[in-house]
Amino acid sequence: MKRSAPPIVTLTTDFGLRDAYVAEMKGCILSHCPTAVLVDISHQIPAGDIEEGAFVLARAATSFPPGTVHLAVVDPGVGGNRRALAAESPRFRAVGPDNGLLAPLLDAARVVALDLDGSDGGQPAATFHGRDLFAPAAARLARGEDLETLGSFVTDALIAAPAAATPAVLHVDHFGNCVTNIDPRQVPAGGRWHVQAGKQRISLRVRTYSEAPAGEPVLILGSDGRLEIALRDGRAATTLNLARGDRLEVIQQESTPPRREKNS
């Protein structure tokens, strides 16, 4: 892949920022591709939470220019028999474990299983494939190397299960907003409806956070087109005791027929 601008490599991990792990990965990438521009998507994915990592990666990936390399490591199976993957689509390239983390990016992508050679041609450390396997592969892609030079093509990369039809909380963001899997366009048209979260009924829909009354949970359309449960000047997740995976209900309210006056 030919490039005129410096290559961009994003990083998404569950490593946190207290330790040196992220810096070691960045150092490895820059050692192999000094011109790379490194962008952190998140390093605060809950440890081993593949589903959360896939959600965050998928949401951010669409904002980057074509040719960006997305490096993602949420890898509770590191050192086991899961494969390491690199993928390429018309918009991006991606590197990560074959555990579903890259699943949202694999549609229409060519995928290879990485050859298990470390950054110095030897075997990678069993506990740190992020540094010794994935980072060098991402750097090679950023340099413009062809995908097939990294491994053998596969067609059975692990993909996530189909999105559940049951309304649920997909993600709780930094502000305590609960991002749901509810697409407002799929809510029955006509009449009134509300979202039931446990014992809490949420029916007030607002366009902006500033429109929300303080202290009252509201429904708002998020920037990714999904319905969110929010609380102005507070954390909806804490107040409503909601977490990722919690089920919700969308309830259509029946219209009340007008009262008929009795004849006197």
Predicted segments, located by residue:
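Active-site histidine-anchored catalytic micro-motif
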Residues: 32-38, 50-55, 65-67, 71-74, ...
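A conserved acidic, glycine/proline-rich C-terminal tail/linker
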Residues: 179-241
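Anionic-ligand-binding alpha/beta catalytic cores of soluble enzymes and soluble regulatory domains
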Residues: 121-182, 186-189
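Generic C-terminus detector
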Residues: 226-264
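Conserved active-site and cofactor/substrate-binding residues in soluble primary-metabolism enzymes
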Residues: 20, 24, 33, 48, ...
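N-terminal glycine-/serine-/threonine-rich phosphate-binding loop
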Residues: 1-81
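Structural motif
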Residues: 7-10, 36-39, 68-71, 84-86, ...
